[in-house]
């Protein structure tokens, strides 16, 4: 189970020393034994990540077909977060913007774009979640036989209109459904 710790308030300009104390037994010890790895210490990957003042906390992509599976609605659900209490004071009430560009991976051709400006209203350190959608005409559909992929390039702009973060995510246009007792992908029986 991944764990994340915000050390923003403990970091100073210049050189810092990061010390980690590991306890062999804790209230979560029974969880640690689930993989039968009963050693103490850090034995999995550890990363130290620096995030911009406003950044993507979570994103979810949905693709919805029209009735004949020719055109699709691309929907991006976003949860943005503010990186620190200091950034919270700076950004509260300011305007920010996201831009989502969709590219066909095999050709690099842009197939859609969504731009949305929003007021930064905070619920603790999370910006109110929102979604954007784009209609994409006749995308190449994803299936196991033809794994056509597209690329989402998401740009988050801060209140100063500078790029705060760029995230890329590959995805496919497909529709899975259980219809008349049959499993179907893109309207075709599996």
Question: Positions of the model-derived regions?
Answer:
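Beta-strand-rich binding/interaction modules
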Residues: 70-120, 130-132
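Accessory beta-strand-rich segments of carbohydrate-active enzymes
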Residues: 1-58
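Short glycine/proline/serine/threonine-rich loop/turn segments at secondary-structure transition edges
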Residues: 11-15, 87-93, 135-149
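N-terminal carbohydrate-binding accessory modules
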Residues: 60, 153-190
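Short acidic/polar inter-strand loop motif in beta-rich domains
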Residues: 23-30, 107, 157-166
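Extracellular recognition modules
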Residues: 19-21, 151-155
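Short strand-edge motifs at loop-to-beta-strand transitions and within beta-strands
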Residues: 3-5, 126-134
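Short proline/glycine- and polar residue-rich coil/turn motifs
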Residues: 8-12, 118-128
């Amino acid at each position: 189970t991944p764990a994340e710790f915000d050390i923003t308030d403990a970091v100073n300009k210049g050189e810092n020393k990061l010390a980690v104390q590991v306890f062999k037994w804790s209230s979560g010890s029974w969880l640690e034994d689930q993989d039968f790895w009963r050693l103490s210490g850090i034995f999995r990957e550890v990363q130290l990540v620096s995030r911009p003042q406003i950044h993507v906390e979570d994103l979810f992509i949905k693709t919805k077909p029209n009735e004949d599976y020719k055109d699709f609605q691309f929907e991006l659900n976003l949860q943005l977060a503010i990186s620190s209490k200091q950034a919270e004071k700076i950004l509260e009430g300011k305007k920010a913007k996201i831009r989502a560009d969709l590219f066909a991976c095999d050709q690099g051709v842009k197939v859609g774009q969504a731009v949305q400006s929003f007021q930064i209203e905070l619920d603790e350190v999370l910006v109110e979640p929102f979604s954007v959608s784009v209609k994409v005409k006749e995308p190449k559909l994803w299936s196991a036989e033809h794994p056509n992929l597209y690329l989402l390039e998401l740009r988050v702009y801060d209140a100063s209109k500078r790029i705060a973060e760029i995230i890329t995510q590959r995805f496919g246009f497909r529709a899975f459904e259980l219809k008349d007792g049959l499993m179907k992908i893109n309207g075709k029986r599996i």
